[in-house]
């Protein structure tokens, strides 16, 4: 017999955005019954727990984008949350360096974008780099971002989950669900139960577009996962103490291989951005799911017809970086303070689940929020989603009529 359960709000997905949404709803509506449901055994198993831990400053994003709207404020609020809860944040700052003369104009454009976004940022001459990060190297100019920092994603997600339950929120794990239409209302169907809610929030990360399609939303979108692999080594004297990033390649929709310092005195290099089939394909065939072949085929077929990204070139250039030596050589263009002979171990990889628009033939780069019937769908909460999570969630709660 199928049991019907009733809630005020049900959130699908116990990542940092799903939990932040639950906290925001309980902050504004403390008497409401709110459930967060997830197919895993604990919060933040995938994107939220496997991201780089970098609190981005907010200068990469187009000034009219949701990413620009929330990243700077999210940086401040996530740091405040960490400080309030005695969680470590390493205020490393970041330099963005030029690898050749062609990067200089793009660097200056990046700086202007940061100014437009109200970010604390400096454009400096190469002779000042030794003062800020002597291990880095640049051509002509570089950007200094003092507010970029590093936190521990797993510790932060755990503390947020504790806050949600302390406020009266409920979790249900080990629960795979699907959305079903019934009498102009969407219900959540699980194994032996059905959930009814005044409002549902689909915050299922890589699976959000799949769930949305079950109730007729977002058929123009497919998910294309990109594998972000890293290598790590013990931090040694002479390694960069700041994060060191390249100027992003305009034909590659990602930030490029960079160096990141961890809270456990390690330095890591990466990530790659290699297109894969599986939404949980963290190793070559680990997590491969043949059911996801269709979306991979549709996404890559669409992008092959597009001038927006060279998907074949991207796959080739990123695939070679899955091997240790080419990845380290790429990072050494940013800093000479890396030794190929150091012990470089694999660091837990992540998946960046990008949405491809089949109609416009582009990889969607901004957050996408759609609502229909009694469901709000968060379809593209990619980087800097972790940094932006608190103000982004507040904006969703305050601006989606279904949640008010």
Model-identified regions with their sequence ranges:
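Flavin-dependent oxidoreductases
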Residues: 20, 180-182, 189-289
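Glycine-rich FAD pyrophosphate-binding loop
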Residues: 26-49
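Short beta-strand to alpha-helix junction loop
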Residues: 62-73, 97-107, 143-163, 315-326, ...
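Helical element adjacent to the flavin cofactor pocket in flavoenzyme catalytic cores
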Residues: 142-199, 203, 207-210, 388-400
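C-terminal catalytic lobe of FAD-dependent flavoproteins
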Residues: 306-404
């Amino acid at each position: 017999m199928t049991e019907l359960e009733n809630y005020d709000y049900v959130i699908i997905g116990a990542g940092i955005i799903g939990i932040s949404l639950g906290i925001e709803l309980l902050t504004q509506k403390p008497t409401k019954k709110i459930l967060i449901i997830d197919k895993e055994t604990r919060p933040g198993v995938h994107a939220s727990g496997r991201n780089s831990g970098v609190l981005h400053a907010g200068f990469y994003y187009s000034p009219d984008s949701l990413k620009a709207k929330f990243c700077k404020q999210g940086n401040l609020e996530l740091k405040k949350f960490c400080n309030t809860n005695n969680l470590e944040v390493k205020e490393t700052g970041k330099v963005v360096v030029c690898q050749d003369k062609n990067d200089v104009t793009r660097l200056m454009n990046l700086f202007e974008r940061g100014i437009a976004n109200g970010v604390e940022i400096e454009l400096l001459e190469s002779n000042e780099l030794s003062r800020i990060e002597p291990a880095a190297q640049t051509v002509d100019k570089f950007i200094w971002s003092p507010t970029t920092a590093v936190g521990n994603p797993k510790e932060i997600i755990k503390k947020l989950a504790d806050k949600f339950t302390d406020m009266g929120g409920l979790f249900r794990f080990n629960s795979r669900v699907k959305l079903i239409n019934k009498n102009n209302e969407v219900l959540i169907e699980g194994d032996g139960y059905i959930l009814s809610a005044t409002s549902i929030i689909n915050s299922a990360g890589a699976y959000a577009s799949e769930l949305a399609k079950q109730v007729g939303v977002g058929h123009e979108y497919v998910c294309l996962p990109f594998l972000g692999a890293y290598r790590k080594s013990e931090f040694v004297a002479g390694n960069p103490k700041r994060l060191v990033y390249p100027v992003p390649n305009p034909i590659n929709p990602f930030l490029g291989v960079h160096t990141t310092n961890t809270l456990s005195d390690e330095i890591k290099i990466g990530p790659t951005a290699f297109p894969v089939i599986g939404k949980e394909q963290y190793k070559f065939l680990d997590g491969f799911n043949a059911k996801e072949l269709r979306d991979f085929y549709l996404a890559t077929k669409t992008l092959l017809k597009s001038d927006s990204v060279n998907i074949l070139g991207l796959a080739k250039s990123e695939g070679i970086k899955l091997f240790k030596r080419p990845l380290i050589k790429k990072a050494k263009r940013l800093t000479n303070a890396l030794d190929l002979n150091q012990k470089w171990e694999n660091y837990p990889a992540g998946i960046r689940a990008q949405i491809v628009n089949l109609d416009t033939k582009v990889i969607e780069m901004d957050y996408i929020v759609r609502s229909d019937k009694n469901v709000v769908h968060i379809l593209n909460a990619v980087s800097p989603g972790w940094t932006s999570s608190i103000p982004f969630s507040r904006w969703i709660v305050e601006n989606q009529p279904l949640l008010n």
